[in-house]
Each structure stands twice: as structure tokens, then as C-alpha cells.
């Protein structure tokens, strides 16, 4: 269910609130504020990475506000506020350095690099708190690697993922 951002209650003189007003002021607002996750995606097919490469998410798990653009692989914020963007991926190549990079409206935010020591160790993740303007700012998951490698989608815990959660206005 898609919920709207909370409205500031208005109390006109001589107006007695109705039960539906309390629903709008209290229940709908709390529902919106506690829902938090506004977008979740995964990639189930393999992709080759080299340098900074946008991750081509192909499985959308949650998108109640219809912000995902499948052709440009970006998610647009539906309303202004603070969001937490988290993402991660795994690679199956040893001795390669990799990094999960959140990108907000074309600006990349590099966090921390991971050097893969074996084909079974190659996961990385990042988290970013960002202020975004509704209908304008967008999020894209990017991976950086020091050499040409493939993303590891061999098991459930290794698939690339992106999650955006609403924090506050």
C-alpha cells in the first residue's frame, strides 16, 4: 500500500474534528513513518564489471511509489526528505579490489574498498544517508573494480542488492 507523507493538521475555528480526521492525522502518518523501505532491488543475472559500472538490477522486490526506471536503472525519490541508501555485491575473482558505490543524482560517494583474497571472499557493501528532493534526485547502485570481473550471483546471499529507506522529512 502506498502511503502519502504526513500532512500538518489544520484546526479551523469552529470546526469539530471527525473520526476520519484522526485517521489522517494519526494512523496514516504513523503508517507512513514506520513503513520506511521505499525501494528494494536485486540482480539475478551475471554482469561484467570494469572500473565504475552501474549495476543493472533486474528483480524489483519493492517499489510502492513506482520510482524505478528500468531503462536507465535509477530510482527517483517520490518526495523530499532524508533517505538511507544501502547496497552490496560479491565477485568471484581473487586479488581484485572492489567497492560498492552509492550514486545520488550523478554524484558517486566512495566508501571503502575490499580486496578479494579468494573466490569465496568477495563481498562488499555501503550505506549512505542522503537528503533528496522528491521527483528530482535519483539513486543508482554502482560497483567499482580494479580489473574486469563478473558479479557473483551463484547463491542467494551473493546477489547484488540495493535498498532505499525513508528516514524523515
Question: What are these language model-derived features?
Answer:
Residues 110-119:
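Solvent-exposed serine/threonine-rich low-complexity stretches and specific carbohydrate-binding patches
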Residues 95-108:
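Short, surface-exposed beta-strand/strand-loop-strand elements in extracellular ectodomains
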Residues 106, 120-140, 146, 153-155:
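Short, surface-exposed tryptophan/glycine-enriched loops
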Residues 84, 110, 138-140:
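General beta-strand recognition
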Residues 5-96, 149-169:
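Terminal (often C-terminal
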Residues 16, 118-125, 162:
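Short, surface-exposed linear segments at secondary-structure transitions and domain or protein termini
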Amino acid at each position: 500500500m502506498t502511503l502519502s507523507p504526513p500532512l500538518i493538521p489544520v484546526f479551523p475555528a469552529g470546526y469539530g474534528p471527525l473520526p476520519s480526521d484522526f485517521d489522517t492525522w494519526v494512523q496514516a502518518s504513523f503508517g507512513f513513518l514506520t513503513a520506511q523501505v521505499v525501494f528494494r532491488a536485486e540482480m539475478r543475472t551475471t554482469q561484467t564489471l570494469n572500473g565504475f559500472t552501474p549495476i543493472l538490477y533486474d528483480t524489483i522486490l519493492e517499489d510502492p511509489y513506482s520510482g524505478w526506471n528500468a531503462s536507465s536503472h535509477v530510482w527517483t525519490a517520490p518526495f523530499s526528505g532524508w533517505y538511507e541508501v544501502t547496497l552490496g555485491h560479491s565477485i568471484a575473482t581473487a586479488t581484485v579490489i572492489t567497492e560498492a558505490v552509492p550514486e545520488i543524482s550523478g554524484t558517486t560517494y566512495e566508501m571503502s574498498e575490499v580486496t578479494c583474497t579468494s573466490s569465496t571472499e568477495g563481498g562488499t557493501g555501503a550505506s549512505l544517508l542522503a537528503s533528496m528532493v522528491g521527483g528530482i534526485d535519483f539513486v543508482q547502485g554502482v560497483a567499482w573494480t580494479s580489473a574486469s570481473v563478473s558479479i557473483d550471483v551463484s547463491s542467494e546471499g551473493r546477489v547484488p542488492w540495493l535498498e532505499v529507506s525513508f528516514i524523515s522529512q
